[in-house]
């Protein structure tokens, strides 16, 4: 078991190292100069050179990468060029909306996707199966910004049940902040439920064809007991896997939704940083998102090793 954990941990570190290199290279490959954006068109060449030296942007790229990587290994993601404060602080200040949005969205996606996938598998080939399969295909093809605009128009503008945008003041009650996240979480939840529906359906179909399920039915057990106690229990591990990965994908994919709804989350911070060419924020945010994704994937691998005897450790 320890060898299995060590090999997975080593693989995780390799992935993060590759991500760090790619993030740095792609950020620097983008056109534009953060110092020019910061100082404006009236800045002189001397002013630009002075600020570039202050942030180490006058050094060769390999040297810049070495400095940045050394700071990252010490837990320092750098200082934002525009916000003038540590990137870790900026990310922490924006983490609450994004985290709550992802958790609410995955709860909605799971509450919709798992039951629909189970029903679709049980009634394979029937009208309800075709209906849920069609809904899953539709959900996978609808752009999040379009669905967000539609929900805003209906539930925020027409009915006035939810705010059009924003997250509330920092000192606003927690319930008020959650209320502001209902529409964006619904957008992400509905769209990501499509993946969970398809995955749950496929997992349940694999299990429903097993001998022990047929044996349970031959014993006269009710269909609900067969499906929920025998089939779902054995199909649950891969379903939990896709739900866990959905959490990571939502954290990284909330950029568009946060922009549409004007949420002050990490996604909105990244968009602003990209427009300003704020290298430290872009690099730090993407590296943290990648680390969260890799850690969730690592945890799921360990879960597999514990509960699934077919996984060799």
PLM segments and residue spans:
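Alpha-helical transmembrane segments of integral membrane proteins
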Residues: 2-4, 16, 91-128, 144, ...
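N-terminal signal-anchor/signal peptide hydrophobic helix marking the start
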Residues: 6-12
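Hydrophobic alpha-helical transmembrane segments of membrane transport/permease proteins
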Residues: 15-66, 83, 159-180
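Membrane-water interface segments at the C-terminal ends of transmembrane alpha-helices
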Residues: 22-29, 59, 70, 134-165, ...
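Membrane-water interface at transmembrane helix exits
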Residues: 23, 27, 31, 35, ...
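Short hydrophobic, aromatic-rich alpha-helical segments embedded in or entering the lipid bilayer
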Residues: 43-76, 213, 262-273
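An internal, D/E-rich "acidic patch" concept
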Residues: 58-114
């Amino acid at each position: 078991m320890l060898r299995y954990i060590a090999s997975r941990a080593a693989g995780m570190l390799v992935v993060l190292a590759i991500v760090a290199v790619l993030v740095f290279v792609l950020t620097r490959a983008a056109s534009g100069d953060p110092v020019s954006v910061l100082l404006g068109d009236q800045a002189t060449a001397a002013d630009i050179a002075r600020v570039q030296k202050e942030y180490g942007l006058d050094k060769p790229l390999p040297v810049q990468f070495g400095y940045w990587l050394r700071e990252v290994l010490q837990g320092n993601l750098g200082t934002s060029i525009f916000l003038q404060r540590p990137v870790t602080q900026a990310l922490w200040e924006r983490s609450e909306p994004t985290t709550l949005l992802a958790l609410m969205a995955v709860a909605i996606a799971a509450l919709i996707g798992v039951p629909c996938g189970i029903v679709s598998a049980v009634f394979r080939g029937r009208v309800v199966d075709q209906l849920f399969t069609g809904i899953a295909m539709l959900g996978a093809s609808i752009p999040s910004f379009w669905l967000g605009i539609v929900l805003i128009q209906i539930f925020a503008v027409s009915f006035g049940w939810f705010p059009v945008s924003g997250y509330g003041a920092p000192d606003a009650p927690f319930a008020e902040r959650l209320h502001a996240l209902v529409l964006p979480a619904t957008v992400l939840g509905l769209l990501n439920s499509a993946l969970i529906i398809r995955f749950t359906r496929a997992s349940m179909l694999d299990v429903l064809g097993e001998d022990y399920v047929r044996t349970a039915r031959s014993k006269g057990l009710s269909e609900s007991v067969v499906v929920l106690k025998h089939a779902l229990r054995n199909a649950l591990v891969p379903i939990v896997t896709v739900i866990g990965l959905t959490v990571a994908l939502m954290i990284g994919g909330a950029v568009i939704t946060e922009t549409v709804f004007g949420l002050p989350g990490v996604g909105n911070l990244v968009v602003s940083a990209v427009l300003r060419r704020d290298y430290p924020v872009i690099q730090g945010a993407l590296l943290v998102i990648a680390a969260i994704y890799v850690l969730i994937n690592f945890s799921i691998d360990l879960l597999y090793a514990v509960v699934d005897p077919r996984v060799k450790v």
